[in-house]
Regions:
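Intrinsic disorder/low-complexity segments
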Residues: 15, 87, 119-120
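STAS-typified acidic loop motif
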Residues: 4-33
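A charged, well-structured terminal subsegment
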Residues: 101-121
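General small-molecule cofactor/ligand-binding pocket signal
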Residues: 6-8, 80, 102
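Residues that form or immediately flank small-molecule/cofactor binding pockets and catalytic motifs
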Residues: 12, 84, 106
Length: 121
């Protein structure tokens, strides 16, 4: 299944819904180009991986490279709704400790809006 990337925006945040495998070839090239293009427009991106059935080593490298590209531009990429297989790959490789991972896109969006601290009396 080729990778399809649906980009939307909410609250100034780019949301990329990935559908299909993130594997060596056009898939990783498309994802890399999409993320780099979005980083020219915004400092906040959420990658939704709910519909990603497989990530190979090149796909994993692309996710890490995208994360680093964002960080180098003082931007943030957060991950949301990982499919069971995506969660497994990120967990086995310990990459999930590098990324901020949220159960849903909504939670990832909210994480960009820190709650005000309570007043101290």
């Amino acid at each position: 299944m080729p990778l399809k990337l649906d980009v939307s925006r909410a609250e100034g945040i780019a949301i990329v819904k990935c559908r299909g495998r993130i594997v060596f070839g056009e898939e990783t090239d498309d994802l890399r180009r999409t993320v780099l293009g979005l980083l020219k427009e915004t400092k906040r991106i959420v990658l939704n991986l709910a519909l990603v059935p497989h990530i190979d080593s090149c796909g994993l490298g692309t996710l890490v490279a995208s994360f680093i590209s964002a960080r180098n531009r003082e931007a943030e990429i957060k991950f949301a709704a990982l499919s069971p297989k995506a969660r497994r790959v990120l967990g086995i490789t310990k990459v999930d400790q590098l990324f901020e991972v949220y159960e849903s896109t909504e939670e990832a969006i909210q994480s960009f809006h820190p709650r005000p601290k309570a007043a101290v009396r």
